[in-house]
Amino acid sequence: MSRTLYDKLWDDHVVYSEEDGTATIYIDRQLLHEVTSPQAFEGLNLAGRPVWRISANLAVSDHNVPTTDRSEGIADPISKLQVDTLDQNCDAFGITQYKMNDTRQGIVHVIGPEQGATLPGMTVVCGDSHTSTHGAFGALAFGIGTSEVEHVLATQTLLMKKSKNMLVRVDGRLQPGSTAKDIVLAVIGKIGTAGGTGYTIEFAGEAIRNLSMEGRMTLCNMAIEAGARAGLVAVDETTIEYIQGRPYSPKGPAMLQALQYWRTLHTDADAKFDAVVELRAEEIAPQVTWGTSPEMVLAISERIPDPEKERDPNKRSAMERALEYMNLTPNTPLSSITIDKVFIGSCTNSRIEDIRAAAKVVDRLGKKVAPNVKLALVVPGSGLVKAQAEREGLDRIFKAAGFEWREPGCSMCLAMNADRLEPGERCASTSNRNFEGRQGNGGRTHLVSPAMAAAAAIEGHFVDVRKIS
């Protein structure tokens, strides 16, 4: 019987199935951070339970850590408590953790793949929505709640039901200036934020095969924003090349054995999907979100839509509310929208490829951050990404242009640390969510690629990076 990649991953991890379709699934890797783990560890302590498989867990503080000088510690008492609690719990249970001043510290969805802790064929969970990132490796990866974090710590299993299969095929070749971020925003714009509900999405096609692992991680990271349970990309030589030699990856005979299995992790030629979505890569322009949902997105060459032209009353109402919150007028060209702050970072776009792309634009433009831009942040996804960028001199390019070069962490992706928007401020952000208040109460978020964010910082408004010679 022919199977999809998702079918194979599911079948390989079912421990027991109920008649109603509920299955006990074995979990290979759990990633932990300071926000969703304290109550899980407390549950273990209250019940007197040990961690079932200590080596299957890897922890890091990322959401609440400061991205400025860390020698003073964490100023906010709640943030400090969460970080200290993770430190204490990991020490008590013997779980490997990259603490705040460890050079390997960073955003959980950056450090997992970077360390080789995410491998093809694995089930990977974390108490974080964007765990879908790890599906780029042909792994079944998804976010879970705190009670489920405790359940995995205690049993290494989860109860769940199988999703349906969706194929998103992107054939053709991307135009110069368009990126993986633009692909996934275009997909969400096409199917909506509920389009993937009940599905696991597999991304395939020529354009996907031509992406680096960093690009594939960006795609899968935002599968959740399309409503999907998880995102997947089949294993190929790009995957294997990325994994080899990393600290957690297999070595010697174990690697040879792993490769035999990994090379089976693709959808069979005649396997059937429950839904298929197709896009042409050459038609995907650089994207900019204009509203308060990732599905409210358009090509940079377009104008803010007019709610009066929307026939569906519910959609029209949502558009009107979004435009009011974003303080935008229908028919305004996206390229004329001025911005107050720029954020280059997050688990979506903070890897070395992203930093290079942004630095290339800054270097090519050869100017400083625009006077109307109050703050332009570059926040590498990990200490190792930061060190690599500094070896390449990328930090000097940013600092010379007036950007701030920060320490790794989640930073301005969400208003949970010192990096945030003030009410009414407008931000060009490489993160994944543009909900009301996501980056700070009253803050207005536009999601873009690293290149688009860098160009907006220099010009003071959105520009089409395809026109930057």
From Swiss-Prot:
Cofactor list: [4Fe-4S] cluster
Protein name: 3-isopropylmalate dehydratase large subunit
This protein's record includes keyword Iron: yes
A GO BP annotation: L-leucine biosynthetic process
Matches recorded under PROSITE patterns: ACONITASE_1, ACONITASE_2
EC number per UniProt: 4.2.1.33
Biological or metabolic pathway of the protein: Amino-acid biosynthesis; L-leucine biosynthesis; L-leucine from 3-methyl-2-oxobutanoate: step 2/4
TM stretches of this protein: none
